[in-house]
Each structure stands twice: as structure tokens, then as C-alpha cells.
Amino acid sequence: MHLEIPEDYGIVNMVSIDPGSNTCGMAVYELDTSTRTINSIMAFTIHVEKLNDNSGLHLDLATDRFVKILKLCNVIKNIIESTNARIVVSEAPFFNKLMPMAYGSLLEIVSSINRTVHETGNEIIFTSYAPQQVKMSLSAAGIKGKDVIKEKLMEVPEVYSKIVGDYDLLDEHSIDAIAVGYTFLVQRCGKKVWK
């Protein structure tokens, strides 16, 4: 399946994800493909520990991490279904030499999200972008700092002006999820195409 967004397809919803085993940033974009307009972006963070465990698994039969991933994937599936999302974009796992064990966990989470998306529907586009690609889409490659992504998104009016709620109240996970979705739009359509 190609990853292009069809023109004149009407309203399409996209879910973008900043994956994590404890906190997972989510953003839901409403896109109008006829006018290439971002109608709205709703962003939030899922705190996995606070989710109900409906897996039916006993902790002595499954690891805590496995149960957390199941809980997270169930919520992601519900979000995809309730928004009728046609596109799901995730940040890809990355290797950090200061935290090498985190790579395996992220890989497991993103693989589980990928499987969940495809179990939800074959017509759903799924792709992922490395953190470096996300930073490059915001012209932030090589710039270090905790609030770099937050500040760079404020410089993109076609995104910043469409965020529902108070931007200053969003945490880094939900902000990163917004940036991941923006990366998809830039990679597939180019900068300044969406308004």
C-alpha cells in the first residue's frame, strides 16, 4: 500500500504516537484532503499504569511489561476505532548508548502497536519515523534541549493554531506525538502544503 494521502478523499483522521511503556503521547489529527487543511489536533498522554487491566492474564503467568503493552495496545485500538483513523504514525525505536536497555522495550512496543494497527484494519496506513527525522521536519536537527520540539512547533502556524486546548498544558509526550504526525505530513506532501 502506498503511503500517499489521496487528494479529495474528504476528511481523514490520523493518529500519531510517541510510544513508551509508562507514558505514551497521542495526537489525533483531523485532515481535510480536499483543501489540504489541518482542521484540528487533539493531543494527550496515556499513563499506562493508570489503565485498567482487562487482559485476563495473571501476573504470575505474564510479565508486568507484557501486561502493560497489552493495556496500551487495547487503548490505541479503541482510539483508532473511535476516530475511524486511516493513518497511524509512530516514532520509531532508537538506540541511546546511555540507556541501551530502552531500545529493546521500545522495539517491542512499536512492533506491538504495528500488529495492533494491522489487526484493526488492513486499509490503515502505518509508518514510523526515527527521532532524527522528526527533528529534521521541524528544522531542529542537531539542536539539544528539553523544549526544542515544543518551541519549534510554535513556529509552524498550520499546526500550532490547530491544537485543541492550552498548548502550555501539554507534556513532552503529547507534544512529541504532534511532531510525529507533522513529520508524516512533511515527508509525504512537503512543507507548507497543509494549512
Language-model features, listed with the residues they occupy:
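Phosphate- and other anionic-substrate recognition elements at nucleic-acid/protein interfaces
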Residues: 1-195
